Amino acid sequence: MSGVVALGHASSWGAALVRISPYTFSAIGIAISIGVSVLGAAWGIYITGSSLIGAAIEAPRITSKNLISVIFCEAVAIYGVIVAIILQTKLESVPSSKMYDAESLRAGYAIFASGIIVGFANLVCGLCVGIIGSSCALSDAQNSTLFVKILVIEIFGSALGLFGVIVGIIMSAQATWPTK
């Protein structure tokens, strides 16, 4: 009976997560930060671009001024790259004897959580900016006075990505590796 309990404890998720190197969590967090941010930017560019091309057939004058929506989507990818660079500078060398100390695990988890926060905030931001950019292109093709009004809404949608970057930077401040 005690063998079953010991086996159950050894195979628990908590025990498995503690055995994974904090550097692995850090690397996954950095990859999620940049990868998911670029995915959000690409998705937003796709949504905006397809509507812009379709609406430009009817009203060619909207093409150049509605490219700002694509630039807002590209900014989302840049947010992810910037945070990935910041997170990478948080990595430090730790002696193998202190690799699984609580401080090392906390640093690895903090970088991982920061990457997840930034990545998925930028994914949502890219979708938001893409949908609003699509609406901006379609409405501008019908009524050119709506462009500036919808552009203001797009700026507020872009703030979602900035909020994610701010929270990610604050979260990454918790990543302190043990000293030698």
UniProtKB/Swiss-Prot annotation:
**What does the UniProt keyword field contain?**
Endoplasmic reticulum, Golgi apparatus, Hydrogen ion transport, Ion transport, Membrane, Transmembrane, Transmembrane helix, Transport
Molecular function via GO = proton-transporting ATPase activity, rotational mechanism
The UniProt entry, under Gene3D superfamilies, shows: lithium bound rotor ring of v- atpase (1.20.120.610)
User: Which is one Pfam family of this protein?
Assistant: ATP-synt_C
SUPFAM superfamilies cross-referenced by the UniProt entry = F1F0 ATP synthase subunit C (SSF81333)
Topological relation to the membrane, as annotated: Multi-pass membrane protein
Parts of the chain on the Cytoplasmic side: 48-66, 132-149
Annotated localization: Endoplasmic reticulum membrane; Golgi apparatus membrane
Q: Does the keyword Transmembrane apply?
A: yes
Asked if the keyword Nucleotidyltransferase belongs to this entry, the reply reads: no
Record-linked CDD domains: ATP-synt_Vo_c_ATP6F_rpt1, ATP-synt_Vo_c_ATP6F_rpt2
Ranges of the Lumenal topological domain = 1-26, 88-110, 171-180
May I have one GO cellular component term? Golgi membrane
Query: Which body tissues produce this protein?
Result: Preferentially expressed in roots.
Family classification: Belongs to the V-ATPase proteolipid subunit family.
What biological function has been recorded for the protein in this entry?
Proton-conducting pore forming subunit of the membrane integral V0 complex of vacuolar ATPase. V-ATPase is responsible for acidifying a variety of intracellular compartments in eukaryotic cells.
- What is this protein's name? V-type proton ATPase subunit c''1
What organism is listed for this UniProt entry? Arabidopsis thaliana (Mouse-ear cress)
